[in-house]
């Protein structure tokens, strides 16, 4: 990735990764890729803001050296210790032995865990706490602890002179800068938020409260583009997402897990009936869609219909895994309808209900559509009743 000028004194030195298949070894990021963002603040003293994944170390070190133009960095500020951001930390520390590492107490605990207790001498560790500052000359960083957004050591850094928020993983987005330069921010930022950060909405709210008093002109996250325009919209979405509120309160998502096609056919029939009533409906086939997209869509809409076949007396595995992911990510504040299928002993509705009742503020529609194979007159009447409930609000 080409070095970018953020301001006269601040450079982007991050690296695009267009070969990674799975982010965190579970979320598909092809063909869009992902970026590992890092920045350099050039002043009387020089601060490097975070490192990158070890797989991108060589390009990153070259970028940093090019920006330094023979100078040595004074500080490496570590806002997040997850390996995609700390994987090259020790490479820079070894290259510049006089450079101090800036972090909070939990940062240094994790450095010792990842790199060994003797990786850094005590005199190279500069520990900061809430609202502590670090002067670089004209520029000054103020630190805001953001525990569990989404790791315990996370902190943001606010550069007071140019009013830049270095936000760690907050406001991040899937997609390399090269491949997604013209892509809208929200779709992959939404997917990133709900699957990576989403469980920790309360902690995100705490960070949003801290930064609400700041004048922010630029947000520099650790993944995705630097944000400079319409910051109010990014903040609005993060506020909405972190309260688990739907972006489309009346939107209906039908999620189906069908073995031989009858449950999928019933889902299509439901979609057609709802659209005939003017409803906004989206479909998701769990047997053909990555869970990260299904989870994101479930949070986007205010209403959800789950259609699942019974399998070995339990839930068809794609639906079981989907519900487990929803619960892990804090799914709440939604209304849910159920469609089950079981040729001789349908149990899916009961099992889905049990799982949903463990979630906060999830309200189930009264009508359950119960299939015994294919949709018939009886189950279609149930479907009509469910349509009436879904469209009554």
Predicted regions and their residues:
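FMN-binding flavodoxin-like domain, especially the glycine-rich phosphate-binding loop
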Residues: 177-219, 223-226, 269-282, 294-393
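Zn-dependent metallo-beta-lactamase
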Residues: 1-45
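Metallo-beta-lactamase
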Residues: 4-8, 102-154, 200-208
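Short N-terminal or domain-adjacent regulatory/targeting segments
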Residues: 220-248
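Active-site neighborhood of phospho(di)ester-bond hydrolases with catalytic His/Asp-centered motifs
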Residues: 49-51, 73-81, 100-104, 165-169, ...
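Active-site metal-binding motif and surrounding structural segment of the metallo-beta-lactamase
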Residues: 44, 55-102
């Amino acid at each position: 990735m080409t070095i970018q000028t953020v301001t006269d004194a601040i450079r982007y030195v991050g690296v695009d990764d267009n070969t990674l298949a799975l982010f965190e070894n579970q979320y598909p990021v092809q063909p869009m890729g992902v970026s590992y963002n890092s920045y350099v603040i050039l002043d009387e003293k020089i601060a490097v803001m975070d490192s990158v994944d070890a797989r991108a170390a060589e390009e990153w070190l070259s970028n940093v050296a090019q920006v330094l133009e023979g100078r040595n960095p004074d500080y490496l500020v570590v806002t997040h210790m997850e390996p995609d951001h700390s994987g090259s930390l020790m490479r820079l520390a070894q290259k510049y032995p006089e450079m101090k590492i800036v972090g909070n107490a939990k940062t240094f605990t994790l450095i010792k865990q990842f790199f060994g207790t003797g990786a850094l001498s005590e005199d190279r560790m500069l520990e900061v706490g809430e609202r502590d500052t670090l002067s670089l000359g004209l520029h000054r960083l103020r630190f805001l602890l953001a525990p569990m957004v989404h790791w315990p050591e996370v902190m943001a850094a606010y550069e007071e002179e140019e009013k830049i928020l270095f936000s760690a993983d907050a406001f991040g987005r899937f997609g390399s800068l090269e491949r997604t330069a013209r892509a809208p921010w929200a779709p992959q930022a939404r997917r990133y938020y709900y699957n990576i950060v989403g469980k920790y909405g309360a902690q995100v709210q705490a960070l949003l409260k801290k930064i609400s008093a700041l004048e922010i002109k630029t947000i520099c996250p650790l993944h995705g583009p630097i944000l400079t325009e319409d910051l109010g919209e990014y903040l609005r979405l993060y506020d909405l997402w972190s309260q688990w509120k739907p972006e489309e309160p009346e939107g209906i998502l039908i999620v189906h897990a069908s073995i031989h096609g009858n449950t999928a056919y019933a889902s299509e029939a439901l979609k057609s009936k709802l659209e005939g009533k003017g409803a906004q409906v989206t479909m998701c086939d769990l047997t053909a869609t990555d869970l990260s997209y299904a989870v994101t869509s479930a949070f986007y809409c205010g209403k959800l219909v789950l259609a699942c076949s019974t399998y070995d007396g339990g839930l068809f595995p794609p639906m079981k895994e989907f519900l487990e992911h929803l619960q892990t990510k804090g799914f709440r504040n939604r209304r849910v309808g159920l469609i089950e299928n079981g040729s001789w002993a349908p149990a899916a509705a009961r099992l889905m209900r049990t799982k949903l009742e463990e979630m906060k503020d999830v309200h189930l529609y009264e009508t359950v559509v119960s299939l015994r194979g294919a949709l018939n007159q009886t189950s279609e009447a149930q479907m009509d009743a469910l349509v009436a409930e879904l469209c009554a609000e």
